[in-house]
């Protein structure tokens, strides 16, 4: 077992609602750690519509999904939250009243007094490519997210996909890997034009390979990949050496392991009471799109409201002997000091 990471609050989901919750918690002296299955913060905003304008954030006439994420990250800087990205909380065990032990699929173990589920519609799950036997290599040679770039040092890496993730990791891993092969169904990419230009320049210089087609089979033993068979768009079949494969076929939304934690569910959503958005288990809260209650509206601004009320109740669990005196950031010198503006 890895060393236990102890924190006041563990937040599952680093989208806008989770990020703002960390701000509210920080004002009340509660330390937060985040776990998110995505390899970057921002949730749906950053993953699905980073450049799409949002028009219903109070006081901000319009902002992009990435712009909102960047602003929230700047806002929570004074509280130094810790992020564990590319991971998913698999198990939650109650060890106190309240206290919880949470374990991720990467083997990290957290102990917290408060657990906040801010996972949007659930966890983003990578789409598995239709390659026979690929399951045997998952987690050892086939990866759906990059957790450590060093994992791919001096390896022949096959990256499959044509979106931003595929292009970004092609460029980022190029200096690390022995050889990068990018495979896509067609010679058109749904990625930032500058990234596509950089990739094509590397191909032209002979520093990486670009192939058009799809993977039809994998070769290897004991979960260790040694090669892949590719059927090209011209129907020619070739074999390439590869030690690692990174398929980026997009994401699908699933409730995920939440269903196994003993939390009450209602149509794949988490019902909560509306004074603090607590679930049926004391100390576990749900905010944002994943929760449900009478009159629920799935707006980011509603999730901000939920995070503010949640933090007030969370304070009772983290500091049971401490009386909470409500303060305003406009007039409280102690809050301004925490924010570094006094």
Curated annotation (Swiss-Prot):
This is Ferredoxin--NADP reductase. Binds 1 FAD per subunit. It holds the Pfam family Pyr_redox_2. It comes from Bradyrhizobium diazoefficiens (strain JCM 10833 / BCRC 13528 / IAM 13628 / NBRC 14792 / USDA 110). One of its GO terms (biological process) is cell redox homeostasis. It is an enzyme of class 1 (oxidoreductase). Its EC number is 1.18.1.2. Homodimer. Keywords: FAD, Flavoprotein, NADP, Oxidoreductase. Its cofactor is FAD. It comes from the Bacteria. HAMAP family: FENR2. FAD binds at residues 17, 36, 44, 49, 89, 124, 289, 330. It catalyses: 2 reduced [2Fe-2S]-[ferredoxin] + NADP(+) + H(+) = 2 oxidized [2Fe-2S]-[ferredoxin] + NADPH. Belongs to the ferredoxin--NADP reductase type 2 family. GO terms for molecular function: ferredoxin-NADP+ reductase activity; flavin adenine dinucleotide binding; NADP binding; thioredoxin-disulfide reductase (NADPH) activity. The keyword NADP applies. The keyword Acetylation does not apply.
């Amino acid at each position: 077992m890895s060393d236990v990471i102890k924190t006041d609050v563990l937040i599952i989901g680093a989208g806008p609602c989770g990020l703002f919750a960390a701000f509210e918690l920080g004002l009340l002296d509660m330390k937060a750690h985040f776990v998110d299955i995505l390899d970057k913060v921002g949730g749906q905003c950053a993953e699905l519509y980073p450049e799409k304008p949002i028009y219903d954030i109070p006081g901000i006439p319009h902002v992009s999904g990435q712009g909102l994420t960047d602003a929230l990250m700047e806002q929570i800087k004074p509280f130094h939250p810790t992020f564990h990205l590319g991971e998913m909380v698999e198990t939650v065990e109650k060890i106190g009243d309240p206290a919880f032990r949470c374990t991720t699929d990467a083997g990290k173990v957290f102990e917290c007094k408060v657990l906040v589920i801010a996972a949007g519609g659930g966890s983003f799950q990578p789409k598995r490519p239709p390659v026979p036997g690929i399951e045997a290599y998952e987690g050892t040679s086939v990866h759906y997210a990059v957790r450590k770039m060093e994992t791919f040092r001096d390896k022949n890496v096959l990256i499959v996909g044509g979106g931003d993730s595929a292009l970004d990791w092609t460029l980022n891993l190029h200096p690390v890997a022995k050889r990068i092969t990018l495979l896509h169904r067609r010679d058109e990419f749904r990625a930032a034009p500058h990234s596509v230009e950089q990739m094509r320049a590397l191909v032209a210089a002979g520093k990486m390979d670009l192939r058009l087609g799809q993977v039809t089979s994998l070769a290897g033993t004991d979960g260790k990949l040694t090669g892949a068979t590719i059927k090209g768009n011209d129907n020619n079949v070739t074999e390439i050496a590869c030690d690692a494969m990174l398929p980026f076929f997009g994401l699908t939304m699933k409730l995920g392991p939440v269903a196994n934690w003993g939390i009450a569910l209602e149509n794949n959503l988490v019902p909560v009471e509306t004074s603090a958005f607590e679930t049926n288990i004391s100390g576990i809260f749900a905010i944002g799109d994943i929760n449900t209650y009478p009159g629920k509206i799935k707006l980011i601004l509603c999730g901000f409201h939920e995070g503010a009320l949640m933090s007030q109740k969370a304070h009772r669990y983290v500091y049971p002997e401490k009386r909470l005196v409500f303060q305003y950031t406009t007039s409280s010198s102690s809050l301004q000091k925490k924010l570094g503006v006094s």
